[in-house]
Swiss-Prot record:
The chain crosses the membrane at residues 26-46, 61-81. The keyword Nucleotide-binding does not apply. It comes from Macaca nigrescens. It comes from the Eukaryota. This is NADH-ubiquinone oxidoreductase chain 4L. Disulfide bonds: none annotated. Keywords: Electron transport, Membrane, Mitochondrion, Mitochondrion inner membrane, NAD, Respiratory chain, Translocase, Transmembrane, Transmembrane helix, Transport, Ubiquinone.
Length: 98
């Protein structure tokens, strides 16, 4: 396997382990989730550049749009929780139910 792909998979794995380790705080979880999305974006970009199929070039852009939407929703949720409770613990998410 090419060392570049191994490094990207290692970055994804480290972000996944960080997500599992620091799952009690929303900020740490969002950062790890963003690291996972960025490693997936880089992997998709490398795959699209290696395969010369013209329709696959749009896939990294779609993934980047989903990552931006995920970041916006996560930050909005973080602001809502921190304004209401002053903490960023994930267990406060159950308190946001109507």
């Amino acid at each position: 396997m090419i060392p570049t792909y191994m490094n990207i998979m290692l970055a994804f794995t480290i972000s996944l382990l960080g997500m599992l380790t620091y799952r009690s705080h929303l900020v740490a979880s969002l950062l790890c989730l963003e690291g996972m999305m960025m490693s997936l974006f880089i992997m998709a970009t490398l795959m699209a550049s290696n395969t010369h199929f013209p329709l696959i070039n749009i896939m990294p852009i779609i993934l980047l749009v989903f990552a931006a939407c995920e970041a916006a929703v996560g930050l909005a949720l973080l602001i809502s929780i921190s304004n209401t409770y002053g903490l960023d613990y994930i267990h406060n998410l159950n308190l946001l139910q109507c």
